Design a protein with these regions (language model features):
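Conserved small-residue
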Residues: 1-57
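Extracytoplasmic gating/loop element in the C-terminal half of outer-membrane beta-barrel translocons
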Residues: 9-11, 26, 83-170, 174, ...
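Strand-connecting loop/turn motifs
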Residues: 71-74, 171-173, 200-202
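Repeated loop/turn-to-beta-strand initiation elements of outer-membrane beta-barrel proteins
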Residues: 73-78, 161-162, 203
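Outer-membrane beta-barrel "beta-signal"
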Residues: 152, 199-211
């Protein structure tokens, strides 16, 4: 169920190779696939011979934006990361929702967004459809655009010219710093991190002194 890399002349190594999907059939709850020759078929007949290049994990634009500010001992450094124009195969969404193991706790989407009866327009296939897991199809390829606050640092530098009590402590200078990593994240794709590696923000404080 994971797209495998292919090495074909004229194609990028970052291309995503999957079988084209036309979505979930409202009548049967099965996924409708499009074969390489243009013929429609069901997910039961998925074949590696029908995979085609759809999407590219290499973004068209990516980079960092950095800025610094200082004023009377105060200072700040901030860094942003951007990435636009690429695609991603949402493997975690496939594993944890579409092909969820019902022996364990599952995401609510396993039942709420899944086909249940004829006429349903659903995002995910009928539950345990013929005992087969969903293979690699274009249904799980998503446009990925990201703008992220990578790091933020705010500090105050004290010396004998701007902070009088520094000399009373026998110091020539001191610096208090607050750092924050991944302080915000925006993406067109909801991050499916699972339970093993939950998202976390990092905060640190630092004090540097000079005598």
């Amino acid at each position: 169920d994971t797209p495998l890399p292919r090495y074909e002349e004229g194609e990028s190594l970052s291309r995503i190779w999957v079988v084209r999907s036309l979505g979930i059939d409202p009548a049967s709850g099965d996924e409708i696939l499009l074969k390489r020759n243009g013929e429609m078929t069901s997910a039961v007949n998925w074949s590696a011979n029908d995979v085609v290049p759809i999407g590219n994990t290499e973004p068209k634009w990516q980079g960092y934006i950095n800025s610094s500010f200082t004023y009377k001992g105060w200072g700040a450094d901030v860094s942003f990361r951007y990435q636009f124009g690429g695609q991603v195969y949402n493997q975690t969404l496939l594993d944890k929702v579409e092909n969820a193991n019902l022996k364990y706790n599952v995401d609510r989407r396993v039942t709420q967004l899944r086909w249940a009866k004829p006429g349903d327009k659903a995002q995910f296939r009928v539950l345990n459809h013929k005992g087969l897991e969903t293979k690699a199809t274009s249904r799980f390829i998503m446009d990925e655009n990201i703008f992220q606050g990578s790091s933020l640092s705010v500090y105050y530098r004290m010396d004998r010219t701007n902070t009088k009590f520094i000399s009373h402590w026998g110091l020539s200078s001191a610096k208090v710093t607050f750092n924050m990593e991944d302080f915000f994240y925006w993406s067109t794709v909801k991050r499916e991190r699972g339970l093993y590696y939950p998202y976390s923000r990092q905060f640190t404080f630092a004090l540097n002194v000079a005598f």
